[in-house]
Amino acid sequence: MFSRLPTSLARNVARRAPTSFVRPSAAAAALRFSSTKTMTVREALNSAMAEELDRDDDVFLIGEEVAQYNGAYKVSKGLLDRFGERRVVDTPITEYGFTGLAVGAALKGLKPIVEFMSFNFSMQAIDHVVNSAAKTHYMSGGTQKCQMVFRGPNGAAVGVGAQHSQDFSPWYGSIPGLKVLVPYSAEDARGLLKAAIRDPNPVVFLENELLYGESFEISEEALSPEFTLPYKAKIEREGTDISIVTYTRNVQFSLEAAEILQKKYGVSAEVINLRSIRPLDTEAIIKTVKKTNHLITVESTFPSFGVGAEIVAQVMESEAFDYLDAPIQRVTGADVPTPYAKELEDFAFPDTPTIVKAVKEVLSIE
């Protein structure tokens, strides 16, 4: 298992440049007539929420600075002006309070979108998320649903230290009653968020701060107000020699690694973007392993009890085990609280060279 290369290497860090915004009510329409057909993840999330707020009067957004400040990361820009303070609600700095309020609203039939400024702060509201929201439908014998979304930035950023860099995908992925989504591209963000808002179950929607300003090509289909995505994995790059299964920002590093492996070593790597942690698309994972006979998983979480560990267990317990020609490798974050110093922070998370090195070891390439 790899957590990093033995030498410190520069990481391709997504820039957090300011983004210009189209008014949410016209964002998707403007793109339909644009020759570029690109959208940032931030714009995708913004347009998804705008369309769902417009579609259903029971949907509302609540959280710290989501209204007058347009969101800490400007994801909710323009929503207050369009929908008013009854639908876009600023709160005090009290995650336990506003999350409990939102869960109560969901139990009464409304459809809240709860924004955490960071999912690290969701720990202040963990009882409401994993007990009240996740378990009520089951404990009521299916008579009481709790339709809501918990969303916000999750995982590592740049220079924010140990208490603001954790990836909570394994935490929430272990809870029955929750669905956990992990978008990578603008199309992922738009389609999955719209699906999550319409889902009758509570959904944890884990975004990545460093992807907010990244632009992606987006299809005509994805610009439709009715566009949603299923909670299924996506093959981002076809390959025949090894499968790289990953999610959110590590998809970017995995695609870069696949390009290097092809050009430098003639290795054809298949890159699988999970898009959903719970439900986990085990069928897609088994299928790619049976195709390539080799597997590595890539995540920025701590090594122990992570998403990669669950994937390894699922593969070992399935028919895919008989197709493996080498042990599975996990590429993870380091087993330490995230350092603040840049040199140490760079060393704490996977990047493109780390993935290349792991693939070479699995395939016994010198």
UniProtKB/Swiss-Prot annotation:
EC code(s) of this entry: 1.2.4.1
Positions annotated to bind thiamine diphosphate: 95
Binding site for K(+): 196-197, 199, 201
Transit peptide feature range: 1-33
Domain of life according to the entry: Eukaryota
Molecular function terms from GO: metal ion binding; pyruvate dehydrogenase (acetyl-transferring) activity
Main location: mitochondrion
Alphabetical list of InterPro entries matching this protein: PDHB_mito-type (IPR027110), THDP-binding (IPR029061), Transketo_C/PFOR_II (IPR009014), Transketolase-like_Pyr-bd (IPR005475), Transketolase_C (IPR033248)
Pfam families: Transket_pyr, Transketolase_C
GO cellular component, one term: pyruvate dehydrogenase complex
UniProt subcellular location: Mitochondrion matrix
Cofactor dependency: thiamine diphosphate
Catalyzed chemical reaction(s): N(6)-[(R)-lipoyl]-L-lysyl-[protein] + pyruvate + H(+) = N(6)-[(R)-S(8)-acetyldihydrolipoyl]-L-lysyl-[protein] + CO2
Enzyme class: oxidoreductase
SUPFAM superfamilies found in the cross-reference section: Thiamin diphosphate-binding fold (THDP-binding), TK C-terminal domain-like
GO biological process, alphabetically ordered: pyruvate decarboxylation to acetyl-CoA
UniProt keyword annotation of Membrane present: no
Keyword annotations from UniProtKB, A to Z: Metal-binding, Mitochondrion, Oxidoreductase, Potassium, Pyruvate, Thiamine pyrophosphate, Transit peptide
Function: The pyruvate dehydrogenase complex catalyzes the overall conversion of pyruvate to acetyl-CoA and CO(2).
Remarks, miscellaneous: Present with 9970 molecules/cell in log phase SD medium.
Assembly behavior: Pyruvate dehydrogenase (E1) is a tetramer of 2 alpha and 2 beta subunits. Eukaryotic pyruvate dehydrogenase (PDH) complexes are organized as a core consisting of the oligomeric dihydrolipoamide acetyl-transferase (E2), around which are arranged multiple copies of pyruvate dehydrogenase (E1), dihydrolipoamide dehydrogenase (E3) and protein X (E3BP) bound by non-covalent bonds.
Protein name: Pyruvate dehydrogenase E1 component subunit beta, mitochondrial
Lineage of the species this protein comes from: Eukaryota, Fungi, Dikarya, Ascomycota, Saccharomycotina
Gene from which this protein is expressed: PDB1
